[in-house]
Design a protein with these regions (language model features):
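Outer-membrane beta-barrel transmembrane domain signature
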Residues: 53-59, 66-170
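A general structural-boundary detector
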Residues: 6, 17, 32-33, 113, ...
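Bacterial Sec-dependent N-terminal signal peptides
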Residues: 1-23, 166, 170
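Short glycine/proline- and aromatic-enriched beta-strand/turn motifs that initiate or cap beta-hairpins
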Residues: 19-75
């Protein structure tokens, strides 16, 4: 009888451990295309899961967005974020903080660049993520605000933004 109870206890513990491991992401790298979001109107992103816990995961993400000079938008955006992901199986809540580096040019009358400089915006992320722990498809929707400043004319300026993304994990 003692052996039976011990066997049942071991089976229960083993299945509990296996169930928790199934919440970890199998694929720790991903590429994503985002409309809106931290790259303003669009961005291509690479993400790496740094800490892969049962419920809590931490990721680092870097993206890039380029806008031609004729668009009137800052030329280059490079958003860099650290995200904390809380998992409920295949559904996740994301909370992130970062900085969107921008590289832009002052242009002359013929639209030729005369002076390039790095600037940027503080940015964040609060959103939903759909990704099965062993799946490759990633779907995301998030509130992605920007904080601009300080400058000679404003202390800080808040810009509300949002984005949706689709990605592939590998």
């Amino acid at each position: 009888m003692k052996t039976l109870w011990l066997s049942l206890l071991l089976i229960t513990l083993t299945s509990s451990i296996q169930a928790n491991d199934s919440l970890r992401f199998t694929h720790k790298n991903s590429v994503q295309f985002e409309l809106g979001g931290n790259g303003l109107f669009y961005s291509f992103n690479y993400e790496r899961i740094i800490l892969n816990g049962h419920r809590f995961k931490t990721s680092g993400r870097i993206g890039i967005a380029y806008y031609p000079p004729s668009s009137g938008i800052i030329d280059l955006w490079i958003p860099v974020l650290i995200n904390e992901i809380y998992s409920f199986g295949k559904h996740h809540i994301e909370l992130g903080l970062g900085y969107a580096f921008t590289y832009s040019a002052t242009r002359d009358a013929e639209n030729n660049p005369s002076n390039w400089e790095w600037e940027g915006f503080y940015t964040g992320r609060l959103g939903y993520r759909y990704q099965k722990p062993n799946g490759r498809l990633i779907l995301r929707a998030a509130f992605t605000p920007f904080l601009e400043g300080p400058s000679p004319f404003i202390y800080y300026n808040f810009h509300a933004s949002g984005g949706v993304a689709v990605g592939y994990a590998f």
